[in-house]
Structure formats: C-alpha cells, structure tokens
C-alpha cells in the first residue's frame, strides 16, 4: 500500500476565515447603535415628534457619530486625526534621503 500525504485543508480554512471576517464586519457596520426612543408602536431613532391624545414625544436625534467624537463640529474628530496623520506620514516619507558622504540621493 503506497503512502499518500494527508489532504491539504489550507484553502478550506482560508475560505472559512474570509467568510467569517466578511460576516463579522458586515454585522459590525450595519449594527444600529442609535438610542431607542419611543415605545413599541412609535420609534423615533433619527429624531422627530409624535403626539396623540394621551402622550407626546419630541426627540431631536443624535448630534454626533459616536461617543468618542465631541459635540462641537471640528475640535476633535477621530477620522480627521487619522487623515492628517496619514498625510503627514506620506509627506515625511517622500523627503529625499541624501547620502552623508556625497550629498546626493541614491
């Protein structure tokens, strides 16, 4: 009986890892994290006003994207900080590195 190598399952594991990653990130991105306002019949997640004979609800909606961002417009925005840092890294990386011996860029 000839010896045969065991089957290679790396493609199966790679496909499972990619599928699980896509499912995880899709669930993470599409998750609703807005505060729930209203009752079972009247839900106002993006703001609004509802009034009937016995109750009234007025909700102005969220003013910021998440709990990390501040309430003001441009003081501290995490995405703006990331963009500025990436631009700074790219700009500093493009500076020519000159040779200390001859002064030229190699």
From Swiss-Prot:
Belongs to the Tymovirales TGBp2 protein family. The keyword Transmembrane helix applies. The lineage of its organism: Viruses, Riboviria, Orthornavirae, Kitrinoviricota, Alsuviricetes. InterPro entries: Plant_vir_prot (IPR001896). One of its GO terms (biological process) is transport of virus in host, cell to cell. Residues 30-73 are lumenal. The keyword Nucleus does not apply. Keywords: Host endoplasmic reticulum, Host membrane, Membrane, Transmembrane, Transmembrane helix, Transport, Viral movement protein. It is found in: Host endoplasmic reticulum membrane. This is Movement protein TGB2. Pfam families: Plant_vir_prot. It comes from the Viruses. GO terms for cellular component: host cell endoplasmic reticulum membrane; membrane. Plays a role in viral cell-to-cell propagation, by facilitating genome transport to neighboring plant cells through plasmosdesmata,. Coiled coil: none annotated. It comes from Lily symptomless virus. The chain crosses the membrane at residues 9-29, 74-94. Residues 1-8, 95-106 are cytoplasmic. TGBp1, TGBp2 and TGBp3 seem to act together for cell-to-cell propagation. TGBp1 is the main movement protein that physically cross the plasmodesma with the viral genome. TGBp2 and TGBp3 would facilitate TGBp1 function.
């Amino acid at each position: 009986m000839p010896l045969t190598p065991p089957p290679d399952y790396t493609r199966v594991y790679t496909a499972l890892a990619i599928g699980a990653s896509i499912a995880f990130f899709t669930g993470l991105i599409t998750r609703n994290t807005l505060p729930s306002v209203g009752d079972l019949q009247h839900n106002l997640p993006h703001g609004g006003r509802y009034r009937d004979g016995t109750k009234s609800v007025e909700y102005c909606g969220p003013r910021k994207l998440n709990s990390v961002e501040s309430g003001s417009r441009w003081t501290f925005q995490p995405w703006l900080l990331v963009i500025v840092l990436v631009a700074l890294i790219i700009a500093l990386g493009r500076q020519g590195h000159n040779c200390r011996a001859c002064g030229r860029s190699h």
